[in-house]
Amino acid sequence: MDYFDYSYKHNYIEFSSTIYRVGTYHYNWHGETEILILLKGRIEMSCNDELFTLEPLDAVIISPQVGHSTLALEEDVIAFTIHVGNEFYQQYDPDFGSYQFVVRSDESTRHNQFFTTLRHHAAMMLLLMAKGESPVH
């Protein structure tokens, strides 16, 4: 069940975002970079054969074409995802589409400056979209 679904395309940037209830095992991959921020509950996530658990406020950044899956470990688990098209990154690095990476927070990094800033900007983008304003300035 999606609570929020938004897409945006303008010149050099294309992205979509969704807030949804995480349920049963869901395996996928896509051509965009995915940022997942866990808002509520706990999930088990697998990325390129690495299995880990996410807690509320944890974030994961997954490069294009990296297979990944999520599984709710309890009821009423809510996640916020942002998918960013490759064109945005390829204007800075033409080889970006060939990279594979997974960057994730855990208990020791959840509140560091990088992940705190990532969550802050994601929340600000969400607020602008909800108000009908452009999230890109």
Predicted features, each with a name:
Residues 1-56, 96-101:
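Generic protein-terminus/edge-of-domain signal
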Residues 54-67:
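Conserved metal-binding segment of the jelly-roll/cupin
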Residues 36, 60, 82:
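Conserved GNAT-family N-acetyltransferase fold
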Residues 132-137:
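Short, solvent-exposed positions on alpha-helices
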